[in-house]
Amino acid sequence: MKLNPFALTLAPLLAAGAFSAHAGPQAHVVCAYHHTLGDDAIMMFGKPNQAMWHDFFGNTHTDAVSTYQTLRDQPETTCDNKADSSAYWAPSLRLPDGTVVKPAYQKTYYQASNVDAWPLHPFPAGLSLLAGDHHGSAPNPHITFLCANGKGYTTKTGEVCGLRKANDAVQFNIGIQFPNCWDGVNLKPAHGLINATYDVKGQCPSTFPVKIPTVNMNIAYVLPTISSLDTSKVQLSMDPIMHGDEREERWGSLYTAHADFMNGWTEDAARFMTDLCMNRGLDCGTTVPYGYSRAKANVWLSSLEPDLSQPEPQVLLVQDNWQNGGRTKNSETLSLVKFHIPPLPAGQDPSQFTYRVRIYGGKVETNGADQIFFYPASNDWD
C-alpha cells in the first residue's frame, strides 16, 4: 500500500470523521445563531448601531470593530469546528405580521470546481467578503430561497411555505453564494470597491486571479408558531435613517438578501482545507483540523534487508504479507515517520482536542483488505 502524504493534525473532538472522496471538493461547518446588533465591521467599521440589524453566527464577540486579530484573540464560536472562529452575518428577517424572528443556525459549505486545472489558494488572514445586493429588487443568481416542504431552492420569491416533513414548524432557508476570485490585494471591500468576483467554470478572471474556496452560506429559519409563510411578503432589515443616535428603521423585500463573511479560520486550517483537502478532490466534512504538520522525515525498512533503508519523500510503502508462509517467509516493510507536534491552543480546554495521524493514498493491489497500525517510536533517527 502506498500512502501520500502523512500529516499529524490537532483536531477538535467535534470534528471527528473520515475523508470522503466521492462528494467533491468541499468542507462544511454548522454555526448556531448567537446575537443581533446594528453593526457591520466590514462596511461600517467603528460605527456601532448605525447599520441595519444583523444576525450573527460563529464568533461570539463579533461587533462593529471586529478584525481578523480580534476574532483569533477571542476565538469562542458557535460553529461545530473550533478551528473556525469566522464571523458570519446577514440582515434580520421580519414576517408578514411584523414579527422579527431569529434564525436557528447557518450551515456553510466551502466548495470548488475544476481544481485540477485551477487549484485553490487558502483564505488569507483578514479576508472579508460580501455577497448579494442590499438594494436588490430582482432575482440574483447567487441568492436562493427554500421552503423545506417545497421543490428546492429558487431565485424567486412568492412561494408559500407550509409545514416541513416533521409537521412541527415552517422552515425557510436563504442561500448566499460568496464570490471566490480575490483580487490578491484588498482584504476588505469598500463602498465603490469590490475585492472579489465569481469564477467562470472554475477559472478566475485576470483582474481577480486568486481562486479561493466558494463560501456557500445557508441560513435556516425554523418557525414553529406559524403554519404557512408567503415569501413575497417577508422582509429583511435595511440600513436605518439616523436622527442623531435615534434609528428610523427601514425594511426591504427578500431580493435585498445579502451576507458578510470575515475569515477567522486558523491559518493552518485554511491551508489544510485547500492544499490537503479540496485541491485533492476530497470532502473533508467537519474534519478540517485546528493545526497540522506534515511529516518532516520518513523512511521505510525491510525485514529481509535490515541494512537497507529507502527514504522517499511523500511516498511511504507499508507491507505485511501473511500469505504463503506468512511473516516468516515474506518481507515486512515498516515505515517510520517523524512529525513536529502542533501545540494545543492557548486558553482553550485541552480535553476538547485530540491528535490524529492522517494519511492519503490507496492500495497497490486490486484485491484484499488492508489494516494500518500506528505505534509511538523513538525519534533518534533521520
What kind of region is each of these model predictions?
Residues 1-22:
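Gram-negative bacterial Sec-dependent N-terminal signal peptides
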Residues 54-57, 180, 338, 357, ...:
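Structural recognition of the beta-strand scaffold that forms the well-ordered cores
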Residues 167-169, 207-208, 327-331, 345-350:
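Short, solvent-exposed beta-strand/turn "edge" segments of beta-rich domains on protein surfaces
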